[in-house]
Design a protein with these regions (language model features):
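Adenine-nucleotide phosphate-binding core of ATP-dependent small-molecule kinases
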Residues: 217-268
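Glycine-rich phosphate-binding loops at beta-strand->alpha-helix junctions
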Residues: 15, 267-289
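Glycine-rich phosphate-binding loop plus the immediately following alpha-helix
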Residues: 132-159, 170, 180-239
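Glycine-rich phosphate-binding/hydrolytic loop that grips phosphoryl groups
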Residues: 295-356
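Phosphate/pyrophosphate-binding loops at sites that engage ATP/ADP/AMP, CoA/4′-phosphopantetheine
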Residues: 46-55, 153-157, 255-270
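Gly/Thr-rich phosphate-binding beta-strand-loop-beta motif of the actin/hexokinase/Hsp70
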Residues: 2-29, 161-185
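Short beta-strand-loop/turn "lid" adjacent to the catalytic site in phosphate-handling enzymes
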Residues: 52-131
Length: 356
């Protein structure tokens, strides 16, 4: 299809990014504070539709098997955000994302939703038991971008690409293991063995039990910001005299995630991506630590766009590939179209798992 126009998005904790591509080349790059999603989701939809796309890859949250918007079931909608009734409307951005889905369903039927890591057939079933978050749909998209960029950088085929990738974001950290060009394991933001800027990462189950009024908002707490206690943004970390132990927990968590994935397979390359990689104080120290501990090649994922974040680029790649464009081969190889099940499929605590 000539002049194939694709929209990919990154529904980040801090910003909502849009990438428009034509025949695989970036043409439109927009970034909005995430508050805009909460306050005016129709404005963002209108901006996407001004591009006259052939396909939009919508914010897919915890993911569903590849589906057009008119194929989504009520359970699929629940699985996008995993909000219980008691938490509805407590987090404005999540409310805005659900409203955006409603608007897209009405205005643009060629909207698609993509899977998260746990739904991929390349991840063995036994790694999925009693897990939900092995990497959200946006983390899968970043992984696809990383596979593509590594194949270019090394001039090799997708099937020869292997790496550990760590996404170091504002809200969450996450890690993926790629072997032979396919994602085979992942550690999502709510399973990560150390804090991100906002989030606690993995939580002691006894602590979860004691937090009787556990809400969705709790998942955005307990990170560097709360450990230090008197900062509001990433750039304030460097000058804060109380940062020391918080940053040790942050860096050790990233090392633990890398070695956790190394226990399955140990590639020679570690890729770092995400908002915090653009903070020189944080990333330079982290690269030195990882190099000294692992003796691996460290690569910062740059992508091919100038402004928007990696997940928007990866989701645009997926959209292009779905329609048989430039990136068809990488979408086919990564088995995105073969994703099955739902993010609750592998919960084995039967008597308790009445989520939906």
């Amino acid at each position: 299809m000539a002049n194939l126009k694709v929209i990919g998005v990154d529904p980040g904790t801090r910003s909502f990014d849009i990438l428009g591509m034509v025949d695989g080349a970036p043409l439109l790059e927009l970034s909005f504070p995430s508050e805009v999603v909460a306050d005016n989701p129709s404005y963002i939809v209108d901006k996407m539709l001004e591009f006259s796309p052939d396909i939009i890859i919508a914010p897919s949250g915890y993911g569903v098997p590849l589906k057009r918007i008119d194929e989504l079931t009520p359970k699929d909608r629940f699985c996008l955000t995993l909000e219980l009734e008691k938490d509805k409307n407590r987090i404005p951005v999540l409310k805005g994302l659900q409203e955006m889905v409603d608007i897209l369903k009405e205005k643009f039927p060629e909207t698609y939703f993509i899977p998260s890591v746990i739904l991929l057939p390349s991840v063995p079933e036994w790694r999925k038991f009693n897990k939900i978050d092995m990497g959200t749909a946006d983390k899968l998209a970043i992984g696809v971008l990383a596979i593509y960029m590594e194949s270019l950088r090394k001039n090799i085929s997708y099937k020869d690409v292997s790496f550990v990738m760590v996404e170091i974001g504002y809200g969450y950290n996450a890690a993926l293991l790629v072997k032979d060009g396919r994602i085979i394991d992942g550690i999502g933001g709510t399973l990560f063995p150390g804090p991100s800027f906002l989030s606690i990462g993995s939580m002691d189950a006894e602590l979860a039990y004691l937090l009787q009024n556990f809400t969705k908002e709790t998942l955005f707490r307990g990170g560097i910001k709360d450990i230090i206690g008197n900062i509001n943004d990433i750039d304030e970390i460097e000058k804060n005299p109380h940062r020391g132990k918080a940053m040790l927990a942050f860096k050790e968590g990233i090392l633990k995630a890398i070695y956790q994935l190394f226990s399955i397979y140990e590639p020679e390359t570690i890729i770092l991506s995400g908002r915090l990689t653009r903070n020189s104080f944080i990333i330079n120290d982290l690269i030195d630590l990882i190099k000294n501990k692992t003796n691996k090649e460290i690569v910062i994922l740059k992508g091919f766009a100038k402004k928007v974040k990696e997940a928007a680029q990866g989701s645009a790649i997926i959209g292009d590939g779905i329609l048989g464009g430039k990136f068809k081969d990488i979408v086919d190889w990564t088995l995105i179209k073969e994703a099955t099940g739902n993010v609750l499929s592998y919960i084995k605590i039967k008597n308790e798992a009445n989520f939906y």
